């Protein structure tokens, strides 16, 4: 296994552990006497002003709109590298994970719609169970130790990367508010400048970051979700340095961001968004359509969608299952894809907490959504771990 993959897996495993601890801490605090301090912390007003431009948001939204843009910058860098020189650069390696990812998106979405098709507010959350939390999934794999074959890790990583790409498209198309033509014009100019910098051979990161900040503000003001600015910025970062000795600007930035995102931003995001009140929690809450749709979408929709699509593609000869992977191991991976957690929480915040005139209904659905995300992700992770542990023990 190459050095990049080893570093990636090590970082994702550590990140998964921290995300889990942050989520547990948030839930414990939310259900203790410290709850007022927790919510006051998340609602601290933070304002940034430059001349006539002012951005004022509570801390929670700075985390969700600002820090998560850095996360999506990293996702974009990984996607670009993978498509240009990684596993996704070889078409034969892409087909099966793409098929699995598509199945893993359609399956959960259909299950969610089955439970919520009569409620237009709840229906906004159809994309919540389609996400996969790569850091958490790799963290579960890390618990199995060195006996996990590289093929399992590569398949899960590739599928999750493609899943991230689809999530970006979903956010861009379905979770945008009223658009501002003026801000979109500024954003378009910033994008053009980014790719002009790439075209004329600018290799330093600083000019891209400065223009990227302008792009983020413009996208934030435009009505399109600001995190997408991170993806666009990533596409403009050059992958080749001035000389082979100087190294790749893209690789350098990706390396620098991995630890910041995995060990700081994602755990902070989990801490800020995973606080679910368990007061009055009973079977009736778990059976709410939004909670059921998301929980079962992650638990059943993901495994049925991924496994069904992969099995059908293999049967029809569209793509072949790697000989080094058993069907039981692929099933374990499909279960791990049901760990939506941070990505699902993020999409949930877009679907329900920015619901405009339907704030009350959206807020209620947001609480049920978080419960569904946590329960579905937890059960998927435990079952995925047990299935893979069993299959690897039999093989050993």
Curated annotation (Swiss-Prot):
<feature type="transmembrane region" description="Helical">
    <location>
        <begin position="59"/>
        <end position="79"/>
    </location>
</feature>
<feature type="transmembrane region" description="Helical">
    <location>
        <begin position="95"/>
        <end position="115"/>
    </location>
</feature>
<keyword id="KW-0813">Transport</keyword>
<keyword id="KW-1003">Cell membrane</keyword>
<keyword id="KW-0472">Membrane</keyword>
<dbReference type="InterPro" id="IPR023171">
    <property type="entry name" value="Na/H_antiporter_dom_sf"/>
</dbReference>
<keyword id="KW-0739">Sodium transport</keyword>
<feature type="transmembrane region" description="Helical">
    <location>
        <begin position="9"/>
        <end position="29"/>
    </location>
</feature>
<feature type="transmembrane region" description="Helical">
    <location>
        <begin position="125"/>
        <end position="145"/>
    </location>
</feature>
<feature type="transmembrane region" description="Helical">
    <location>
        <begin position="223"/>
        <end position="243"/>
    </location>
</feature>
<feature type="transmembrane region" description="Helical">
    <location>
        <begin position="373"/>
        <end position="393"/>
    </location>
</feature>
<protein>
    <recommendedName>
        <fullName>Na(+)/H(+) antiporter NhaA 1</fullName>
    </recommendedName>
</protein>
<dbReference type="Pfam" id="PF06965">
    <property type="entry name" value="Na_H_antiport_1"/>
</dbReference>
<comment type="function">
    <text>Na(+)/H(+) antiporter that extrudes sodium in exchange for external protons.</text>
</comment>
<feature type="transmembrane region" description="Helical">
    <location>
        <begin position="332"/>
        <end position="352"/>
    </location>
</feature>
<dbReference type="GO" id="GO:0005886">
    <property type="term" value="C:plasma membrane"/>
</dbReference>
<feature type="transmembrane region" description="Helical">
    <location>
        <begin position="260"/>
        <end position="280"/>
    </location>
</feature>
<feature type="transmembrane region" description="Helical">
    <location>
        <begin position="281"/>
        <end position="301"/>
    </location>
</feature>
<feature type="transmembrane region" description="Helical">
    <location>
        <begin position="154"/>
        <end position="174"/>
    </location>
</feature>
<keyword id="KW-0050">Antiport</keyword>
<dbReference type="InterPro" id="IPR004670">
    <property type="entry name" value="NhaA"/>
</dbReference>
<keyword id="KW-0812">Transmembrane</keyword>
<comment type="similarity">
    <text>Belongs to the NhaA Na(+)/H(+) (TC 2.A.33) antiporter family.</text>
</comment>
<keyword id="KW-1133">Transmembrane helix</keyword>
<dbReference type="GO" id="GO:0015385">
    <property type="term" value="F:sodium:proton antiporter activity"/>
</dbReference>
<dbReference type="GO" id="GO:0006885">
    <property type="term" value="P:regulation of pH"/>
</dbReference>
<feature type="transmembrane region" description="Helical">
    <location>
        <begin position="177"/>
        <end position="197"/>
    </location>
</feature>
<keyword id="KW-0915">Sodium</keyword>
<keyword id="KW-0406">Ion transport</keyword>
<keyword id="KW-0997">Cell inner membrane</keyword>
<feature type="transmembrane region" description="Helical">
    <location>
        <begin position="200"/>
        <end position="220"/>
    </location>
</feature>
């Amino acid at each position: 296994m190459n050095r990049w993959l080893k570093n990636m897996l090590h970082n994702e495993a550590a990140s998964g552990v921290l995300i889990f601890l942050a989520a547990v801490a948030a839930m414990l605090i939310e259900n203790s006497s410290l709850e007022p301090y927790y919510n006051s912390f998340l609602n601290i007003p933070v304002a940034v002003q430059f001349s006539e431009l002012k951005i004022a948001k509570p801390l929670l939204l700075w985390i969700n709109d600002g820090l998560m843009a850095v996360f999506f910058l990293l996702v974009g860098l990984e996607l670009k590298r993978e498509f240009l020189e990684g596993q996704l650069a070889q078409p034969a390696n892409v087909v099966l994970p793409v098929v699995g990812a598509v199945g893993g998106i359609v399956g959960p979405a259909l299950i969610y719609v089955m439970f919520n098709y009569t409620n237009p507010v709840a229906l906004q959350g159809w994309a919540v169970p389609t996400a996969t939390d790569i850091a958490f999934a790799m963290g579960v794999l890390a618990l199995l130790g060195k006996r996990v074959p590289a093929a399992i890790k590569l398949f899960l990583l590739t599928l999750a990367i493609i899943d991230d790409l689809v999530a970006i498209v979903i956010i861009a198309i379905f979770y945008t508010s009223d658009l501002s033509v003026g801000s979109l014009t500024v954003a378009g100019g910033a994008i053009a400048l980014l790719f002009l910098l790439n075209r004329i051979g600018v290799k330093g990161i600083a000019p891209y970051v400065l223009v990227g900040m302008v792009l983020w503000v413009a996208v934030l003001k435009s009505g399109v979700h600001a995190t997408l600015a991170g993806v666009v910025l990533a596409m403009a970062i050059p992958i080749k340095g001035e000389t082979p000795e100087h190294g790749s600007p893209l690789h350098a930035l990706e390396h620098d961001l991995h630890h910041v995102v995995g060990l700081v931003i994602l755990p902070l995001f989990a801490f800020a968004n995973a606080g679910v009140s368990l007061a009055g929690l009973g079977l009736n809450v778990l059976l709410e359509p939004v909670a059921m749709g998301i929980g079962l979408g992650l638990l059943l929709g993901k495994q049925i969608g991924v496994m069904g699509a992969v099995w059908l593609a293999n049967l029809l000869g569209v793509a072949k299952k790697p000989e080094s992977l058993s069907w039981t191991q692929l099933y374990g991976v499909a279960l791990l894809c049901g760990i939506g957690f941070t990505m699902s929480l993020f999409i949930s915040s877009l679907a329900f907490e920015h619901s405009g005139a339907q704030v009350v209904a959206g807020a209620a659905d947001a609480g049920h959504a978080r419960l569904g995300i946590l329960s579905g992700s937890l059960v998927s992770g435990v079952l995925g771990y047990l299935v893979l542990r069993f299959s690897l023990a039999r093989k050993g």
